[in-house]
Amino acid sequence: MTHLLDYQPLNLYTNYQEAAEKTPTVPIIFDESLPAFPALGLETTYGESHQEILKRAYQLAALGVKKGDKIIIYKSPKFDTYLLAVAASYLAAVPVMVSYHLPFETIEVFVDRLEDPYILFDDVTAEKVQAV
């Protein structure tokens, strides 16, 4: 029965990498610039965005993020939230994408349960993170 399914496990980085390799010149157009990826501008390609994801992953690694670490991504709802999760996945870290609507008390619960994770945030959620 399993031979009927062409299944590949979901891995955010591997899936993005494969898309970038197969279709590097396919355009990606944004309606606004992405704060966490300003170099992408309003228009990029899979290939170019893949390189920016790697740069961000290397920056996260330089901050100490490594395999198995949890990273709460708690920021405004933009496409860069997903790209940050892909960068974390490259390092074999575990991205935890959390809605920016949640109060700091909920984030405190995440921090406790995830055993002191990294938190990526932006100006929209900075005040709530300071309260954690």
What are these model-predicted stretches?
Residues A85, Y100-A131:
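Conserved ATP-dependent adenylate/AMP-binding module captured primarily in the ANL superfamily
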Residues L40, A57-E105:
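Conserved AMP-binding/adenylate-forming
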Residues F30-E32, A36, L91-A93, M97, ...:
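Carrier-protein-dependent adenylate-forming modules in NRPS/ANL systems
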Residues S49, I53, T81, I107:
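Aromatic/hydrophobic pocket-lining residues that form the small-molecule binding cavity
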Residues M1-L63, K67, L91:
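N-lobe entry segment of adenylate-forming
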Residues E18, Q59-L63, V109, R113, ...:
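A generic secondary-structure signal
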